[in-house]
Swiss-Prot record:
Domain of life: Eukaryota
Name listed for the protein in its UniProt record: ER lumen protein-retaining receptor erd-2.2
Membrane spanning residue stretches: 3-21, 36-53, 62-80, 97-110, 118-137, 150-168, 179-199
UniProt entry keywords in alphabetical sequence: Endoplasmic reticulum, ER-Golgi transport, Membrane, Protein transport, Receptor, Transmembrane, Transmembrane helix, Transport
GO cellular component terms attached to this protein's record: endoplasmic reticulum membrane
InterPro entries tied to this protein: ER_ret_rcpt
GO MF terms held by the record: ER retention sequence binding
Cytoplasmic side of membrane: 22-35, 81-96, 138-149, 200-213
Positions on the Lumenal side per record topology: 1-2, 54-61, 111-117, 169-178
Length: 213
């Protein structure tokens, strides 16, 4: 049993649950970037298109279905049920600046040119930067609700824990994938400043988080 991978997946699942509960209970998606959520939906769609053709384990299949369903549910809530609360004017990050480079990188740096492999590689690259619209939105508004901060911390922890998973697999299985490791490090670095602000302004004060603009 790889405790690091399970912990990472549980942290990821916790992040998604926090986000869905935040939106549903408050009846609002204020402070949440729909553009980031669309990118995450694209990430999981590209990564899990092999859902019905490749079976690894019940755990793996269950997590795939859960992440897909939860992400699309979030997008639905933001664009339909609670669309009037979506901060469209502030959520302006140009996602094509992330999607196009990720697609080009997937074509240039990959393990194989098989369709599913290219889609998987694209999803790894895109996931590394998919949080940028959310961080950009926080920077634009200058603050984050406590529950939104908890969501982002859990999401960042998921990727940080996966770094320990890769270290564990390297020493126990002699497994090393430079694509996922480099992308994971980039993603973790993007969260670094947020982690610091989370600890100093949310955990210690138990209040919302004001960001320097």
């Amino acid at each position: 049993m790889n405790i690091f991978r399970i912990s990472a997946d549980m942290s990821h699942l916790l992040a998604i649950i926090i986000l869905l509960l935040k939106i549903w209970k408050s009846r609002s998606c204020s402070g949440i970037s729909a553009r980031s959520q669309i990118l995450f939906a694209l990430v999981f769609t590209a990564r899990y298109l092999d859902l019905f053709s490749t079976y690894i384990s019940l755990y793996n299949t269950t997590m795939k279905i859960t992440f897909l369903a939860a992400t699309y549910a979030t997008v639905y809530l933001m664009f339909f049920k609670f669309r009037s609360t979506y901060m469209r004017e502030s959520d302006t990050f140009r996602v094509e600046l992330l999607i196009v480079p990720a697609a080009i990188l997937a074509l240039l740096i990959n393990h194989d040119f098989a369709p599913f492999e290219l889609l998987w590689t694209f999803s790894i690259y895109l996931e590394a930067v998919a949080i940028l619209p959310q961080l950009f939105l926080l920077q634009s508004t200058g603050s984050a609700e406590v529950i939104t901060a908890h969501y982002l911390f859990a999401l960042g922890s998921y990727r940080a824990l996966y770094i320990f998973n890769w270290i564990y697999r390297y020493y126990t299985e002699d497994y090393f994938d430079p694509i996922v490791v480099v992308a994971g490090i980039v993603q973790t670095v993007l969260y670094a400043d947020f982690f610091y602000l989370y600890v100093t302004r949310v955990v210690q004060t138990r209040k919302g988080m004001e960001l320097p603009i």
